[in-house]
Amino acid sequence: MKVLAMILAGGRGSRLDILSEKRVKPSVPFAGKFRIIDFALSNCSNSGIYDVALLTQYLPLSLNEHIGSGKPWDFDRRDSSITMLQPHEKLGGNSWYQGTADAIRQNIDFIKNKNPKYVLILSGDHIYKMDYRWMLKEHEENDAELTIAVQPVPIEEASRFGIFEVDKDKKILNFEEKPAEPKSNLASMGIYIFNTDSLLEYLEKLENSDLDFGKHVIPSMIQEDRKVYVHTYDSYWKDVGTYDSYLEANLDLIKKSEEVGINLYDQGWKIYTRSE
């Protein structure tokens, strides 16, 4: 298998207020007929990635029922699979996922059994349409160990994001989380392609109990001058992890698609969902 997609879909979503009171963030309805998770799943399916795992944790029932066998996204085929990965009890330790990378680390045996060449790590609460094949193409051309999707943002808003500084070849020189005086406008989208051996190396050697990609894994790889690059994405993307951003994303749909940059009904890149 070439690519295994792992979608982080266990966030409690307290900043979404009552919307996520009885369901996990990615299971929250969006634009009437969709769920937020539909975007990451449809992007995988449209990109030809049919081996997908969802890492769930908080109130997973609604999400599990929505996903089912994965048929709307073509994950029920003989050469496809979709797996729900819940945290499990470990000897002498907390079973809950403690950080983004810890969630992946707790499923390290799953990755080893799948034995993919690359692991694509996604967030389950973003609204966007992206062909991951272009990102993978750049990853291979750069002979990268890790490629991170970034979006250029207005420099006056850059202090709200994790920001990367890169050289002329887009190799990452520095990363700073929410800098007071940003030196770049390349904001992290929380989308990563790892070479599997590099991912496993860092999951196994970093001992932080709350292991996180932004706080621990990425800074360590940059500090050790590993081959870490960015892939620039400049189309519509919205992290809907807060009530305000969720409302903004829904209001964006009132505008003309050419103004906003996203069309939910474009037949060339469909967003699939479960038919109730």
Which residues make up each language-model segment?
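A structural signal for short hydrophobic beta-strand segments in well-ordered beta-sheet cores
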Residues: 27, 163-166, 230
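Conserved core of the sugar-phosphate nucleotidyltransferase
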Residues: 129-197, 204-206
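Active-site glycine-centered loops adjacent to acidic/histidine catalytic or metal-binding residues
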Residues: 11, 125, 242
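Conserved N-terminal catalytic core of the sugar/cofactor nucleotidyltransferase
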Residues: 1-7, 15-21, 29-123, 127, ...
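Left-handed beta-helix
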Residues: 1-4, 197, 204-276
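Residues that scaffold the ATP/ADP-binding catalytic core of kinase and kinase-like folds
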Residues: 66, 175, 201-202, 249
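Glycine-rich beta-alpha junction loops
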Residues: 59, 89, 153-154, 179, ...
